[in-house]
């Protein structure tokens, strides 16, 4: 019987003498978490990391700034006019190796040679999220099964790292943290003594403060996840803080909250389901188990709209620890193209549509923000309310459109078709003519002319069974062409978009002309037998309409009793299903802004978008 090989003789073993090798996928949070556990558990005397020795001083300065991120900049040895940027981010395993090593009082060795010309290695790895299911050991073994590319440059680079390791304390336990794609070249180089590599001094190394707006573009893991990892690493729990599906779910949910708050639109259940399916499919196409931030943004734009995609990207970029300015460092706003190669771009048209990729006009003002939380609330008076005139024009125009549409639909319902004899009446009925083509006869159509006009329009977006629209108000038209209006909505001053400017979402509204006649609909005892808000608006519409017809647009028609009430008042209800209206127009018309005084009207244009 043959003798079982010792661990030191096993080519697959990561324990070689006093060296323990911990291969990682650079920048990925799963490896950072596993590495921190290993360092805190084993407490090695030396931690060797795959970082250039020339960056040691500035790298330690960057670590001292954490959790605020930094970027190291040094000239490209092959082209001094170009710079190389190295982001120092919490989720990077090399960052975690140095941080945790210093915590356990280990000596930290920067073992990468200062040759200035790092070889380009294939950096395609299986999705690190699989570690949760198979463990880190099986992940590493599965990667090593397939031989990786070897070149003279890779061998020389590995030899330089091996030389640094061979010069460490031979009696101390050494934890070697290196990229997974360099593991086997370094293991081979450690089998024989190595010569000191050529050293190239870098002329100038600078530490920069990246602006918070650019973090999502320059970091490997998106900042939202980095922030959660910072909270996770102190206790290494709870695990769901950095579990990717849970992080993705929380990010999309928080982005949805901001989307509803900023636009007044509501995401439907089917959109959430499709969003989950879309992100899963995009991840599968990329060979990943969980979608990244780019795929999530693409899915958000495809399933919902550009506004939601913006909120997803903005939420992913949220990193509260990062400051927009630094007293000691220069602040830079970098792009992905300056850090990475083969970047992908996604254009989000959030505020200004750009047909045919036209340039945005010069002088386009950015949306104003509060200087500090609660600034606009302090400036809100709340003693009176009024509307925003440009929105009045839009909703009046929409009301006229609905009235024309209602009359047209009623006329269509009353039309009749007959064979052509002496007059084509209101035109040829193509459908009926084609249906009876074998007869060789023409059929014409006669529309029934509607006598009378529409005196009131009621539009119900939501019946509000859950009391999501508690704000009830009635306001009067300011001139002869502006309707009196009663509506229920979300509380506008709970969502301020400017000083004294509240943003709300209609649940439903009533419009009627002529103006200056309507008393408060919501406190009128004549309508108290209404079972809900839509019925109260319909009763008021029947009561205040000076014309025969009253338009009612909702998801379902009113109860039959309202037909009797309408007939008693010599009125007729014209019902239009809400689904028959253009969704884009509905979305636009549903947002309303309420101002706390007439003086705000001059300021509102700077805050509304």
Annotate each PLM feature.
Residues 1-609:
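Compositional signal for N-terminal targeting/processing segments
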């Amino acid at each position: 019987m043959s003798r079982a090989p010792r661990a030191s003789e096993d080519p697959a073993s990561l324990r070689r003498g006093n060296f323990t090798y911990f291969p990682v996928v650079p920048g990925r949070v799963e490896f950072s978490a596993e590495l921190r556990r290993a360092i805190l558990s084993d407490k090695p005397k030396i931690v060797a990391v795959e970082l250039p020795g020339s960056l040691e001083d500035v790298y330690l300065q960057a670590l001292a700034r954490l959790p605020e991120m930094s970027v190291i900049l040094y000239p490209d040895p092959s082209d001094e006019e170009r710079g190389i940027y190295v982001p120092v981010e919490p989720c990077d395993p090399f960052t975690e190796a140095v941080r945790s090593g210093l915590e356990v009082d280990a000596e930290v060795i920067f073992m990468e040679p200062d040759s200035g010309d790092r070889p380009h290695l294939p950096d395609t790895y299986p999705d690190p999220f699989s570690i949760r299911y198979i463990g880190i050991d099986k992940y590493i073994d599965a990667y090593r099964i397939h031989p990786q590319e070897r070149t003279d440059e890779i061998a020389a680079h590995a030899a330089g790292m091996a030389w640094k390791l061979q010069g460490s304390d031979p009696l101390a336990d050494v934890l070697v943290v290196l990229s997974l794609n360099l593991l086997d070249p370094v293991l081979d180089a450690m089998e024989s003594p190595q010569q000191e590599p050529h050293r190239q001094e870098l002329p100038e190394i600078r530490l920069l403060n990246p602006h918070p707006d650019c973090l999502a573009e320059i970091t490997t893991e998106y900042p939202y996840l980095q922030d959660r990892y910072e909270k996770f690493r102190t206790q290494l729990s709870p695990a769901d803080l950095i579990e990717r599906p849970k992080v993705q779910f929380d990010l999309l949910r928080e982005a949805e909250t901001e989307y509803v708050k900023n636009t007044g639109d509501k995401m439907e259940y089917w959109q959430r389901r499709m969003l989950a399916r879309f992100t899963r499919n995009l991840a599968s196409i990329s060979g990943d188990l969980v979608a990244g931030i780019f795929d999530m943004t693409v899915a958000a734009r495809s399933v919902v709209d550009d506004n939601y995609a913006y909120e997803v990207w903005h939420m992913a970029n949220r990193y509260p620890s990062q400051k927009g300015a630094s007293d000691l460092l220069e602040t830079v706003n970098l792009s992905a193209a300056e850090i990475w190669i083969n970047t992908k771009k996604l254009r989000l048209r959030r505020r200004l549509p750009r047909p045919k990729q036209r340039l945005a006009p010069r002088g386009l003002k950015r949306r104003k923000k509060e200087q500090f939380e609660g600034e606009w609330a302090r400036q809100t008076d709340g003693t009176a309310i009024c509307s925003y005139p440009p929105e009045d024009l839009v909703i009046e125009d929409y009301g006229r459109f609905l009235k024309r549409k209602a009359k047209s639909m009623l006329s269509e319902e009353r039309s009749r078709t007959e064979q052509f004899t002496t007059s084509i009446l209101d035109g040829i009925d193509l459908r009926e003519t084609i249906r009876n083509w074998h007869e060789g006869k023409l059929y014409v159509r006669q529309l029934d002319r509607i006598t009378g006009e529409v005196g009131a329009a009621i539009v119900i977006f939501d019946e509000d069974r859950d009391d999501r629209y508690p704000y009830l108000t009635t306001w009067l038209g300011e001139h002869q062409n502006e309707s009196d209006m009663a509506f229920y909505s979300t509380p506008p001053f709970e969502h301020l978009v400017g000083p004294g400017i509240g943003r709300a979402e209609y649940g439903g509204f009533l419009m009627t002309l002529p103006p200056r006649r309507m008393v408060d609909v919501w406190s009128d005892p004549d309508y108290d037998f209404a079972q809900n808000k839509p019925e109260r608006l319909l009763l008021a519409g029947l009561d205040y309409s000076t014309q025969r017809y009253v338009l009612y647009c909702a998801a379902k028609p009113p109860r039959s009793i309202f037909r009797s009430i309408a007939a008693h008042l010599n009125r007729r209800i014209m019902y239009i299903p809400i689904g028959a209206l253009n969704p884009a127009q509905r979305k636009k018309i549903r947002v309303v802004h309420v101002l706390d005084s007439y003086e705000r009207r001059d300021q509102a244009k700077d805050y509304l978008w």
